[in-house]
Amino acid sequence: MTATKQTAQVTAVADGTVVTPKGFQAAGVHAGLRYSKKDLGVILCDVPASAAAVYTQSHFQAAPLKVTQASLAVEQKLQAVIVNSACANACTGEQGLKDAYEMRELCAKQFGLALHHVAVASTGVIGEYLPMEKIRAGIKQLVPGVTMADAEAFQTAILTTDTVMKRACYQTTVDGKTVTVGGAAKGSGMIHPNMATMLAFITTDANISSAVLHDALRSITDVSFNQITVDGDTSTNDMVVVMASGLAGNDELTPNHPDWEHFYEALRKTCEDLAKQIARDGEGATKLIEVRVRGAKTDEEAKKIAKQIVGSNLVKTAVYGADANWGRIIGAIGYSDAEVNPDNVDVAIGPIVMLKGSEPQPFSEEEATAYLQQETVVIEVDLHLGDGFGVAWGCDLTYDYVKINASYRT
């Protein structure tokens, strides 16, 4: 399920949030799980919304994800997502599962919802139990609203080592109606999704069934959240949840709808925007790295090589040091299990071609260094084997990454 090559009519909403689509409210409070910052949030929908989710592939899937899957299994509808930071509630056994179910029950009771219309998410330190006394009191403090302040309170409540809030919003037209997609995400370390290592909450007022929404989300996740890496670690907790209120008033969307491409592109842009923000905010990062691979046998192989390059610690440290060592890029391509012709590969860093037909090209070290000092570094590779294309995003690897993770619990 993919968008066509035509340019879809999609517009970015600069100040848009998860409450910009019709029918959504949000809130965030300080419940005491963290020292002073907000740590408990909720997104609430006015009606039971069509819903879809994708989850971490970690064997140690955390308790909140199991509860969310149980909720969605009933009728694929959600009306609220309750989220805490500071404690992952992962590897916490039966007690952890019991606590996650209690979070769902408390949220449902607070807002008068059916139990199975509530999703639960947690992020933070693994192997610690939720302080349920604080969760119980905190949920009672949640008063959702539709203002920017309400959305930002939620966005702040879901952060861990993030340095900035991540939000995105796009609008399009379906059946002459304005359809909006808004999103909020967290993620800075343990970023190597499959689907994993981050949380994203996406809202839309599109009229769409849960089944069609799920297919679209799966397809888009593969070219957005699953194509980012910060440190190669996969989390126990993370997921993407999408809720669609249907309040835009359009005819129900399917891939056969004449405006399907518009909605699909708005959802894709929202996910890609959030994914790139997560990569840019990698722990200790100073630069966003974008790797574009073309000429692969298939799109899958192109995506695989792009992610291999952007995940290479040697490439990441070279970018941090503004060192145009293209041999590290070749090294990353070389240990990929995708098909490669080693006698015909092109490599460029930004506008500077460094390898053409697997032959080194003369280039100015000064120009290359100047380019690598920019906040966004683009690496392009052409394999000359087919039409496969893929993009991946990551960040440089700095001294601060070690400092942050050496003292994460202190």
UniProtKB/Swiss-Prot annotation:
Signal peptide: none annotated. Belongs to the ArgJ family. CDD domains: OAT. Gene3D superfamilies: arginine biosynthesis bifunctional protein suprefamily, ArgJ beta chain, C-terminal domain, L-amino peptidase D-ALA esterase/amidase. The gene is argJ. The lineage of its organism: Bacteria, Bacillati, Bacillota, Bacilli, Bacillales. It catalyses: N(2)-acetyl-L-ornithine + L-glutamate = N-acetyl-L-glutamate + L-ornithine; L-glutamate + acetyl-CoA = N-acetyl-L-glutamate + CoA + H(+). The record marks T123, G124 as: Involved in the stabilization of negative charge on the oxyanion by the formation of the oxyanion hole. Catalyzes two activities which are involved in the cyclic version of arginine biosynthesis: the synthesis of N-acetylglutamate from glutamate and acetyl-CoA as the acetyl donor, and of ornithine by transacetylation between N(2)-acetylornithine and glutamate. The keyword Lipoprotein does not apply. This is Arginine biosynthesis bifunctional protein ArgJ. Substrate binds at T160, K186, T197, E283, N405, T410. The record marks A196, T197 as: Cleavage. GO terms for molecular function: glutamate N-acetyltransferase activity; L-glutamate N-acetyltransferase activity. It holds the Pfam family ArgJ. The keyword Kinase does not apply. GO terms for biological process: L-arginine biosynthetic process; ornithine biosynthetic process. It is found in: Cytoplasm. Keywords: Acyltransferase, Amino-acid biosynthesis, Arginine biosynthesis, Autocatalytic cleavage, Cytoplasm, Multifunctional enzyme, Transferase. Pathway: Amino-acid biosynthesis; L-arginine biosynthesis; L-ornithine and N-acetyl-L-glutamate from L-glutamate and N(2)-acetyl-L-ornithine (cyclic): step 1/1; Amino-acid biosynthesis; L-arginine biosynthesis; N(2)-acetyl-L-ornithine from L-glutamate: step 1/4. The active site is at T197. Its EC number is 2.3.1.35, 2.3.1.1. Heterotetramer of two alpha and two beta chains. One of its GO terms (cellular component) is cytoplasm.
